[in-house]
Amino acid sequence: MACGNKENEPIDKLTTKFAGLRHDPILDQQIQPLLNQYFAVMAHLQEQDSVNLQLYGTNMIFIADSLIQQDVSLDTATNHLAIQGLMNIQNEMTAILMESNPDARIMGAQMLSLQWIEFLAAIGYQKQTIYIFRDKEENCWMGLKNKGTNPYENKMDLQYQPIQILQELQ
């Protein structure tokens, strides 16, 4: 999956489709602690001391592992999509934590964000509005507000506008 691009497709849109029919409010509730860890990881991505990144990343891995071990949805297809998405998120976070190079961690965080967007869209997540951002280098990330800073840069004074809302991906 990539932040988009077939040749004639606008590059300011993602190719992921939101599967609203898959929405399961219980699943939304179950993944909320995991989603909170994603936002914590992204908030600590630029810190020189990686202790917080390690803490939140490890928590994300443990929570994902716990969810993978259970049926997270009564719908078999949604359950399968959720488990696959959780495994992808877990694998991306594991790769980030194994990496000591800050640039490689940033690249891993970009992949983590893409996996999250794909996962949330696939399960029809609706508990909160998820805003999707992209910078001019086509790095994607998510936020809960309609303005946000770029977690991949140290410029915390530069505000970005979302390119899309997860629940409106078509």
PLM features per residue range, with description:
Residues N8-E9, L27:
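Aromatic-residue hotspot detector
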Residues M1-A2:
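C-terminal motif of bacterial Sec signal peptides marking the signal peptidase cleavage site
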Residues K17, L21-E47, V51-Q170:
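Mature extracytoplasmic or organellar-lumen-exposed domains after removal of signal/transit peptides
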Residues E9-A19:
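Juxtamembrane and targeting peptides
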Residues N5:
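Short, conserved catalytic or interaction motifs in soluble domains
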